[in-house]
């Protein structure tokens, strides 16, 4: 199962094993490099181990009433500017105070750096959540690059514009709910007119037209 990763909104990121790798400086620098390319303006980050007490609902002994959870707390460091646009230093924001999109991007960047050349299968539910379509396009380009030739990414999305990304037709699948409320899965590759050049077809437009 270490070759299979599921990314969803239910996992508490601060206690995720991958997030702990940000304590390693070399690993952290690779993640920051990816964040900079994605234009998130993060210059550095500080990761530190913290302990959190959690109510133990199984043990009733007074002394064993709490479990100690090891977590990682992260500060993100951004460039700051004066009113003329000149850099004045950095400002620090704890990741619990940053946007959902930034935290999610940090998580995905961590997963991608860790998965490099390891032959992993990564499932990402609601891939476009909290992301502008340009960020989704950037991430899909990385997923489909030679860097990730040994990995497989399986993502779900409601973002129609992603249909026009430079993907092979056998990489695009649709889920349709039948009148029996059963989900049916079918591939874009199964359509009969795929002898046309992929670049000449807007699948997003055709999908919206119901073609």
Please provide the spans of the model-predicted regions.
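Hydrophobic anchor residue at the start of the ABC signature
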Residues: 108
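Phosphate-coordinating catalytic segments in nucleotide- and nucleic-acid-processing enzymes
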Residues: 1-105
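Short basic/glycine-enriched coil/helix segment immediately N-terminal to the Walker B
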Residues: 112-120
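Walker B catalytic acidic pair
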Residues: 125-127
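The start of beta-strands in P-loop NTPase/AAA+ ATPase cores
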Residues: 91, 120-121
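Conserved D-loop-proximal element of ABC-family nucleotide-binding domains
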Residues: 129-133
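C-terminal lobe/lid and adjacent interdomain/linker elements of RecA-like ASCE P-loop ATPase modules
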Residues: 118, 138-211
């Amino acid at each position: 199962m270490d070759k299979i990763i599921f990314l969803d909104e239910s996992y508490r990121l601060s206690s995720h094993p991958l997030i702990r790798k940000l304590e390693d400086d070399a690993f952290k620098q690779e993640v920051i490099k990816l964040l900079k390319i994605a234009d998130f303006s993060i210059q550095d980050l500080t990761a530190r181990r913290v302990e959190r007490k959690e109510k133990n609902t199984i043990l009733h002994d007074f002394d064993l009433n709490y479990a100690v959870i090891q977590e990682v707390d992260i500060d993100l460091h951004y460039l700051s500017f004066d009113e003329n646009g000149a850099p004045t230093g950095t400002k620090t924001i704890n990741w619990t105070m940053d946007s959902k999109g930034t935290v999610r991007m940090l998580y995905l960047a961590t997963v991608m750096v860790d998965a490099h050349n390891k032959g992993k299968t990564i499932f990402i539910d609601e891939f476009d959540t909290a992301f502008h379509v340009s960020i989704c396009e950037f991430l899909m380009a990385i997923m489909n690059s030679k860097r990730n030739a040994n990995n497989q990414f399986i993502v779900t999305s409601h973002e129609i514009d992603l249909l026009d990304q430079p993907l092979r037709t056998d990489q695009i699948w649709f889920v349709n709910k039948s009148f029996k409320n059963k989900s049916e899965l079918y591939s874009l590759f199964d359509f009969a007119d795929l002898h046309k050049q992929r670049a000449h077809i807007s699948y997003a437009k055709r999908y919206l037209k119901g073609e």
